Amino acid sequence: MEFVDEKRYRKIKNGVGRAVADFNLIEEGDRIAVAVSGGKDSYTLLHILEALRRRAPVKYDLVAFTIDSGYPGFRSDVIAAHLKEHGFSHHVEATTHYDIIKEKRRPGSSYCSICARLKRGVLYTLAQQHGCNKLALGHHLDDFVETLLLNQFFVGTLKAMAPRMLADNGATTVIRPLVYVEEREIIPFARENSFPVVCCCCPVCGKADIQRKRMKELLKELERENPAVKRSLLRALANVQPRHLLDRELQRVCEVP
């Protein structure tokens, strides 16, 4: 695919390439399942990974997966048409997640968390069924720092996301190659390259996750004083000083001569 803005494309590609090198995200012979929801982030991830694949010093394969959660009006056909046009291997998995969520969701709670858990489980299964050893997700830099703040403010844990981690099933390695890419770089990239963004059609889409929206607002406020605040928060995740934290287990480890 020829990208409209070469400078923006290279900036995003270089960010992904740096993450791949820093965290050893892609290795020789990998078969990578890429979760494609129809959103700007997952389209960007898939196209950039393909662009890197064509010139990478290691050989790897990509397989795109879309989970249809059963929300009325979800246009998986639009996603399928775009990926077919660009030669991607693609599989759509239909589920009854919407019915499960309606039954299990607590009154007043968000659809997002339970929906994400259900999708992730299906993606792990699909990855194994299709011989994929890795699963690539489209979380970008903003997602990392927002999650860090959410966990600190509302959960009381010092925790964000990992760019690379072994899934609970013990068989699939989850990778997040967009860790160094900001959302404000992805938005125009997706728009100018006419990625056919598809709404998830969740009944409360745009209304849920008020806490995450508040974190976005807070970061915007902080950026007025320090434009590099998000990247500073991301650097903090790679610059942990255990001796200066309150975790007792870490304190014991640090005291061992």
Swiss-Prot record:
Q: Which residues bind [4Fe-4S] cluster?
A: 112, 115, 202
Record's miscellaneous remark: The thiolation reaction likely consists of two steps: a first activation step by ATP to form an adenylated intermediate of the target base of tRNA, and a second nucleophilic substitution step of the sulfur (S) atom supplied by the hydrosulfide attached to the Fe-S cluster.
Q: Which organism is it from?
A: Geobacter metallireducens (strain ATCC 53774 / DSM 7210 / GS-15)
Q: Which cofactor does it need?
A: Mg(2+); [4Fe-4S] cluster
**Its Enzyme Commission number?**
2.8.1.-
Q: How and how many cofactors are bound, per the record note?
A: Binds 1 [4Fe-4S] cluster per subunit. The cluster is chelated by three Cys residues, the fourth Fe has a free coordination site that may bind a sulfur atom transferred from the persulfide of IscS.
Q: Where is it found, in Gene Ontology cellular component terms?
A: cytoplasm
CDD domains the UniProt entry points to = TtcA-like (cd24138)
List, alphabetically, the Pfam families matched. ATP_bind_3
For this UniProt entry, what is the primary localization, expressed as one broad class? Answer: cytoplasm
Recorded GO molecular functions are:
4 iron, 4 sulfur cluster binding; ATP binding; metal ion binding; transferase activity; tRNA binding
Print the keywords alphabetically: 4Fe-4S, ATP-binding, Cytoplasm, Iron, Iron-sulfur, Magnesium, Metal-binding, Nucleotide-binding, RNA-binding, Transferase, tRNA processing, tRNA-binding
Compartment(s) of residence: Cytoplasm
Name of the featured protein: tRNA-cytidine(32) 2-sulfurtransferase
Q: In which pathway does it act?
A: tRNA modification
InterPro entries named in the record? Rossmann-like_a/b/a_fold, TilS/TtcA_N, tRNA_Cyd_32_2_STrfase, tRNA_thiolation_TtcA_Ctu1
| Quaternary structure note | Homodimer.
Lineage per the UniProt record: Bacteria, Pseudomonadati, Thermodesulfobacteriota, Desulfuromonadia, Geobacterales
| Keyword Calcium found | no
Q: Which GO terms describe its biological process?
A: tRNA modification
Q: Which reaction does it catalyse?
A: cytidine(32) in tRNA + S-sulfanyl-L-cysteinyl-[cysteine desulfurase] + AH2 + ATP = 2-thiocytidine(32) in tRNA + L-cysteinyl-[cysteine desulfurase] + A + AMP + diphosphate + H(+)
Question: Is ATP-binding a UniProt keyword of this protein?
Answer: yes
Q: To which protein family does this belong?
A: Belongs to the TtcA family.
Motif annotated as PP-loop motif, chain positions: 37-42
* Gene3D superfamilies with a match to the protein in the record: HUPs
Q: What does this protein do?
A: Catalyzes the ATP-dependent 2-thiolation of cytidine in position 32 of tRNA, to form 2-thiocytidine (s(2)C32). The sulfur atoms are provided by the cysteine/cysteine desulfurase (IscS) system.
